[in-house]
A protein has these predicted regions:
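Long, low-complexity, charged/polar intrinsically disordered regions in eukaryotic proteins
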Residues: 1-11
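Exposed, interaction-prone assembly regions rather than primary DNA-binding/catalytic cores
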Residues: 119-126
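Alpha-helical linker/hinge and terminal dimerization helices associated
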Residues: 35, 73, 102-117
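Basic, amphipathic "hinge/linker" alpha-helix immediately C-terminal to the N-terminal HTH DNA-binding motif
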Residues: 82-106
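Residues within the DNA-recognition helix of helix-turn-helix
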Residues: 66
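Alpha-helical residues within the helix-turn-helix
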Residues: 53, 71-72
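N-terminal helix-turn-helix DNA-binding core of bacterial DNA-binding proteins
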Residues: 15-62, 89, 97
């Protein structure tokens, strides 16, 4: 795995700064739809309709916006095949695969602590 060294200022890499590039990227990818898209793609290459079908509750518009954002940030690769009608496929890039590991750990954490969180919510509401 080849990681490119960030050449910007330390301020740009500081998540705590509201105007930093790191905060902008974090804000982009740390939303429920982006995380679910990353988990859904996994190590597969899928067409738009397959991703849409696999993620319950996501709208066509939200999937489009999030795939574009993930592509813009270099986490998803979009391939268009010159067929009629055009065939478009999506796959995670190397950095996207790296983030997938973190997303997968978050999914595992959620499953592991569901009971505890459900109980805490009950106490909070009750």
């Amino acid at each position: 795995m080849v990681t490119k060294q960030f050449s910007g200022s330390p301020d740009e890499a500081d998540l705590r700064r509201a105007d930093s590039l790191a905060r902008e990227i974090f804000s982009d990818v740390a939303n429920k739809w982006a995380l679910l898209i990353i988990e859904t793609l996994g190590d597969r290459t899928l067409r738009f309709s397959e991703v849409l079908k696999d993620i319950d509750g996501i709208s066509h518009k939200m999937l489009t916006q999030n795939l574009r954002m993930l592509e813009r940030n270099g986490l998803v690769e979009r391939t268009v095949y010159p067929t009629v009608p055009p065939r478009v496929e999506y796959t995670l890039t190397e950095p996207g695969q790296g983030l997938r590991g973190t997303v997968h750990l978050m999914c595992d954490w959620t499953q592991q602590h569901l009971g505890h969180i459900e109980e805490a919510r009950g106490r909070f509401s009750g």
